[in-house]
């Protein structure tokens, strides 16, 4: 266990899962900063990572002290030495609002996907079942940067304790966890080699989060999400289901979120793939849009699940379809996220 003090100017944006309701008007996205040329280090981080499968990974409960507060996480990794000389890749995993690290590990399918690629996973535990996905303080989260500090502390600890390669650290989040992952990516693109967000969007004004540099981002979102609409959420309707211990945070649309990261990374080469047909009448289908910067290798990918709800495609989360909507069973979010982050 290590102690970590507050760093000056620390404000990390992470993709975190959050619950909200349909029927909101889209909010105009904040202006993105002018793209900057990626550094040589950044270009290296955007190149594919060699996959080295492991068969002996186990999960252990760990703690780290951050600004005097003990925070918990679950580390899933091989106890042996990393197969790669520079260390093992690491992905921070952020559960949704009202969820837990244990639930995320049990139902996401990420352990199997990560083991097949040799990636260590750190399932972080949120405070009061949620995250500071927005830089705006709340009664439950008076310090909006506490979760940013937590993420940094876990990476710092595991860089030594688990032989993690600091140049290949990622974040994966669902719902409010997806929002937290996006916040981390936006505010600290130099900390991560990529993030994957499922059912997450960037916060909207007045507590907006703006991407500040190039970083690979994967967004997976259902266009029939009944909790946090695909077109964003300005205010939650009165009949929003109670999820977690705080009201949902306002966000911009999925398209605006993705576009903000494209612009920040100078990724203006566009490609769209046609929708995968639904497996059955009334089922879900997917389409994919990619923006890329061919000079750096950076990609921002948006997968839309047509007919999909506020769900983790391919997962086994025990959520009622009447509340969260339909779950796509053909797409494996776990495999897709790990493959994207490692440069597949």
Swiss-Prot record:
Quote one Gene Ontology molecular function term: hydrolase activity
Basic and acidic residues biased stretches: 266-276
Q: What domain of life does the native source organism fall in? A: Bacteria
UniProt keywords (A-Z) are: Hydrolase, Signal
Outcome of gene disruption: Disruption mutant still produces nocardicin A at levels near that seen for wild-type strain.
Q: Which InterPro entries match?
A: AB_hydrolase_fold, Plant_Biomass_Hydrol_Est, PLipase/COase/thioEstase, TAT_signal
> Region (Disordered): which ranges?
265-295
Listed transmembrane segments? none
Q: Where is the signal peptide?
A: 1-34
Report the enzyme's class at the first EC level: hydrolase
Modified after translation how?
Answer: Predicted to be exported by the Tat system. The position of the signal peptide cleavage has not been experimentally proven.
Any extra detail in the entry? Part of the biosynthetic gene cluster for the beta-lactam antibiotic nocardicin A, but disruption of the gene shows that NocK has no obvious role in nocardicin biosynthesis.
The UniProt entry's sequence similarity note says: Belongs to the AB hydrolase superfamily.
Question: What's the protein name?
Answer: Putative esterase NocK
- The scientific name of the source species is Nocardia uniformis subsp. tsuyamanensis
């Amino acid at each position: 266990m290590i102690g970590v003090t507050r760093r000056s100017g620390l404000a990390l944006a992470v993709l975190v899962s959050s619950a909200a309701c349909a029927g909101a008007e889209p909010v105009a996205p904040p202006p993105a900063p002018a793209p900057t040329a990626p550094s040589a280090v950044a270009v290296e981080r955007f190149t594919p990572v060699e996959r080295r499968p492991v068969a002996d990974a186990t999960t252990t409960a760990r703690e780290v002290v951050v600004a005097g507060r003990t925070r918990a996480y679950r580390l899933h990794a091989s106890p042996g030495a990393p197969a790669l000389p520079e260390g093992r890749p690491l992905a921070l995993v952020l559960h949704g609002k009202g969820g837990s690290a244990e639930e995320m590990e049990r139902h996401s399918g990420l352990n199997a996907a990560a083991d097949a690629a040799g990636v260590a996973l750190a399932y972080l535990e949120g405070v009061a079942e949620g995250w500071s996905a927005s830089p705006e303080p709340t009664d439950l989260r008076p310090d909006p940067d506490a979760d940013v500090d937590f993420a940094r502390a876990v990476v710092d600890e595991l860089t030594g304790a688990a032989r993690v390669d600091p140049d290949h650290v990622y974040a994966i989040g669902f719902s409010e966890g997806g929002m937290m992952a996006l916040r981390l990516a936006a505010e600290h693109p130099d900390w991560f080699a990529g993030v994957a967000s499922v059912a997450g969007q960037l916060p909207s004004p007045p507590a907006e989060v703006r991407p500040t540099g190039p970083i690979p981002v994967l967004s997976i979102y259902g266009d029939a999400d009944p909790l946090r609409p695909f077109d964003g959420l300005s205010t939650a309707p009165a009949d929003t289901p109670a999820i977690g211990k705080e009201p949902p945070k306002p966000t911009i649309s999925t398209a605006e979120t993705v576009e903000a990261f494209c612009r920040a990374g100078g990724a203006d080469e566009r490609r769209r793939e046609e929708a995968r047909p639904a497996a059955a009448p009334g089922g879900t289908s997917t389409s994919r849009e990619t923006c890329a910067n061919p000079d750096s290798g950076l990609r921002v990918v948006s997968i839309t699940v047509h007919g999909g709800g506020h769900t983790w495609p391919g997962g086994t989360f025990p959520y009622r379809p009447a509340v969260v909507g339909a779950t796509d069973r053909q797409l494996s979010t776990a495999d897709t996220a790990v493959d994207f982050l490692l440069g597949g």
